[in-house]
From Swiss-Prot:
The keyword Aminoacyl-tRNA synthetase does not apply. This is Pyrichalasin H cluster regulator BC2. Residues 298-309 have a biased composition (Polar residues). The gene is BC2. Its main location: nucleus. GO terms for cellular component: nucleus. Residues 297-321, 362-383 are annotated as: Disordered. It comes from Pyricularia oryzae (strain 70-15 / ATCC MYA-4617 / FGSC 8958). Induction: Expressed exclusively during fungal penetration of host leaves, the time point at which plant defense reactions are triggered.
Length: 434
């Protein structure tokens, strides 16, 4: 066990309550010195752990040796027989694919990342795709899913190529959804300003978000910029063909530049829904891992069972000390858990930074006239920011999330604190052996 510490595998073995030190402090880990049933393996990571999730190659480790601890699916009564079973990989798991252009579900080679310049249509499309992905692929997390994800760095290194493919585990899908959310958060300023920036202006048919501006001229002019108004005045140049349209509901009308064809849909609210949903998945994942680690050790004496099962109490109750009578945690499982904790923690940090960037104020110009325009635009922008944060706080509270002043009311701080508790409890449960 001492060889592992000499390899610099962990940056800190302390069990403090306030530090946030990484469990992994380098990108390459040589871990072939431990006598774990003759298993020798090398783990190699990549610098950006958020996008390089599960790009870890394991060698020389059999499936039997890669068993996982019993709270994640193995009957504790079977621990004494010496047999440990790896989690099942469900190749038949149905994963939704979203084609970047057609929007059809079930297409292979999908991506939720933007493939074109920012426009209202592209942002709506990405928000819709992420919303659908969240509610169809991340709505259910089982202990078996988590056990599979924690050991996946040693089993399926090729799954990183298709984070939404059939071999993608629950954490890969969560990280993928988080990356998509980062892209949507970066578009908030674009949505707040109502596309007033000419450099990011959408097509002419999408330009007006404020609703139709009907102008009814006098009858002597016989002109109107509104096609509907022309029909109301009986001045339209063509009939509506009501019989044909009644029988064929799939007809699409191509808007002319003078028409208002875009409804002001709640795109920002959809993005906020995705944010709250993704945070809920992080919170549930951390809670399930925390409960499993607690089952490996012992609960604090005198702590009611209701406090251990409450998400609020889970985030505030002190970590228990390990029970000397319990078996040590399975080493590959501890290693995989530390890797996945670092990945998820890093992604939460990126989400926090993305929100900070979206909410920051930009310096003004020296030109007086331009300053006046910027003051007006700044007032509108500040109003939209305050309204967005107020809505987000309400949605977080409605879903049982804790709010912290440190994260600006985005709910990331409380979820990150729960992740830190898992890290500290892991240090307790492994008894400093790893």
């Amino acid at each position: 066990m001492e060889d592992i510490g000499k390899a610099g595998f962990f940056s800190d073995k302390s069990i403090g309550t306030g530090e946030n030190t990484p469990l992994l402090d380098s990108y390459t880990f040589d871990f072939d010195s431990g006598p774990y049933g003759g298993a020798h393996y090398t783990i190699t990571g990549v610098p950006d752990m958020s996008t390089g999730f599960s790009t870890f190659a394991g060698t020389g480790l059999s499936a039997t040796e890669m068993g996982y601890c019993y709270p994640f699916g193995v009957d504790p009564s079977s621990r004494g027989d010496g047999s440990i079973h790896p989690p099942k990989c469900r190749y038949e798991k149905s994963i939704m694919q979203v084609h970047p252009e057609s929007g059809d579900l079930g297409m292979q080679g999908a991506t939720l990342f933007p493939s074109s310049p920012t426009s209202l249509e592209s942002v709506r499309k990405r928000a819709l795709d992420l919303h659908c992905f969240l509610f169809t692929q991340l709505h259910c997390v089982t202990d078996e899913d988590l056990a599979e994800a924690i050991l996946s760095p040693f089993i399926f290194s090729e799954s990183v190529k298709e984070p939404t493919g059939p071999r993608a585990n629950i954490i890969q899908r969560l990280i993928y959804a988080s990356e998509c959310l980062l892209g949507l958060i970066s578009t908030l300023s674009f949505l707040w300003t109502g596309c007033e920036d000419s450099g990011n202006s959408p097509p002419a048919s999408m330009a007006n978000q404020q609703g139709p501006q009907f102008q009814f001229p006098s009858r002597t002019q016989h002109k109107s910029n509104s096609v509907l108004a022309q029909h109301l005045l009986g001045l339209a140049g063509r009939s509506l063909h009501l019989e044909d349209s009644a029988n064929f509901t799939g007809r699409q009308h191509t808007a002319s530049p003078s028409e208002t064809s875009v409804v002001d849909l709640p795109t920002i609210t959809t993005i906020l829904t995705c944010h709250v949903g993704i945070l809920s998945v992080y919170r549930y994942t951390f809670s399930r891992i925390h409960d499993a680690l607690r089952a490996c050790g012992s609960s604090p004496s005198g702590t009611p069972e209701s406090e251990l099962t409450s998400p609020h109490k889970r985030a505030t109750t002190c970590s228990p000390l390990p029970n000397k009578d319990t078996l040590p945690l399975n080493m590959p499982f501890v290693l995989g858990l530390r890797v996945q904790l670092e990945i998820m923690t890093h992604m939460l940090d990126r989400m926090r930074a993305a929100w900070a960037t979206a909410m920051e104020d930009h310096p003004g110009h020296e030109d007086h006239q331009q300053q006046q325009e910027e003051v007006k635009q700044h007032d509108r922008l500040s109003h939209h920011k305050r309204a967005t944060l107020a809505t987000l706080k309400s949605m977080l509270a409605l879903n049982g999330h804790e709010l912290s002043n440190q994260d600006g009311g985005t709910g990331i701080g409380a979820v990150g604190d729960l992740g830190d508790r898992v890290r500290r409890l892991l240090r307790n449960c492994d008894k400093g052996m790893y």
